[in-house]
From Swiss-Prot:
MF GO annotations: adenyl-nucleotide exchange factor activity; protein homodimerization activity; protein-folding chaperone binding; unfolded protein binding
Bias kind Low complexity: ranges: 17-40
Protein name: Protein GrpE
Record text on subunit structure and interactions: Homodimer.
Cellular component terms (Gene Ontology): cytoplasm
Chief subcellular location: cytoplasm
Keyword presence, Zinc: no
Classification via HAMAP family: GrpE
A single BP term in Gene Ontology: protein folding
Species of origin: Prochlorococcus marinus (strain NATL2A)
Length: 259
């Protein structure tokens, strides 16, 4: 009877202690679960090969990923090089086209300028004979009466206006007398000996030449010196009276010998 009571009291005391420390029971339970799991993993022979297989698969995936990244990097670099080459090609083509267009523009401008100059030269060449006639009239005419002088002054005024217009257009007369003959500027019409001028020096201007903005508008017609002429050799002429006297003396001597 007493033994039963003591045993029941012992059980009650254990139950009370367990109820008074619920935290201890709750903390100790996870550790106990982890230890149990470790024991179960260590005891299970299939777990270790599975872990090894997972690590191998991970390594294979990493290596394949690195290979793919290397392949993508090489493709990107090749594509970049190709784009750089295409850029250089297009840039060179653009520079060539730009240079060709610039040359075309300059050539067109030069051709237009040349055409303008040709038209101007053609027009002025038709006007120059009128200027020549005015100059001849000024040199040859010598008006004496008052009316003639008034008429002379009037057309000389027209001549001055015409010369001024030509000057404004860039026309300038040549100065050729006493200059060395230049076939690019002069046209030799006559050649004659001259004791005063050296050879190939312009003696006289027969028709005035003109420049147009540095270009030859009309060549000058000139007379060119040939230099000093050949010297005349003055041979001594024997005295006719002396020869006659010698002839008479020889005749007299011959007659004396005969006698």
């Amino acid at each position: 009877m007493n033994s039963d009571v003591s045993s029941s009291e012992h059980e009650l005391s254990q139950d009370g202690s367990s109820q008074n420390n619920p935290s201890e029971n709750s903390v100790s339970s996870p550790n106990s679960n982890e230890s149990v799991n470790q024991v179960e993993l260590s005891d299970n022979p299939e777990v270790e090969p599975q872990v090894k297989n997972d690590s191998v698969d991970t390594a294979n995936e990493q290596s394949s990923t690195s290979c793919e990244s290397n392949i993508k990097g090489s493709d990107t670099e090749a594509r970049l090089q190709q784009l750089e080459k295409e850029h250089e090609t297009l840039n060179s083509q653009y520079m060539r086209i730009a240079a060709d267009f610039d040359n075309f523009r300059k050539r067109q401008t030069r051709d237009q300028d040349d055409l303008k100059i040709q038209l101007t030269c053609t027009t002025l060449s038709e006007i120059l004979p009128i200027v020549d006639n005015f100059e001849r009239a000024r040199q040859q005419l010598n008006p004496e009466g008052e009316e003639a002088q008034a008429l002379h002054r009037s057309y000389q005024g027209l001549y001055k206006q015409l010369v001024e217009v030509l000057k404004n257009l860039g026309v300038a007369p040549m100065r050729v007398v006493d200059q060395a003959f230049d076939p690019s500027l002069h046209e030799a019409v006559m050649r004659e000996p001259s004791d005063e001028k050296a050879e190939d020096i312009v003696i006289e201007e027969l028709q005035r030449g003109y420049h147009l903005n540095g270009r030859v508008l009309r060549h000058a017609l000139v007379k060119v010196s040939m230099g000093p002429g050949p010297k005349v050799i003055n041979e001594e002429i024997p005295d006719q009276s002396a020869s006659n006297q010698e002839l008479s003396e020889s005749v007299d001597g011959s007659t004396k010998d005969e006698n």
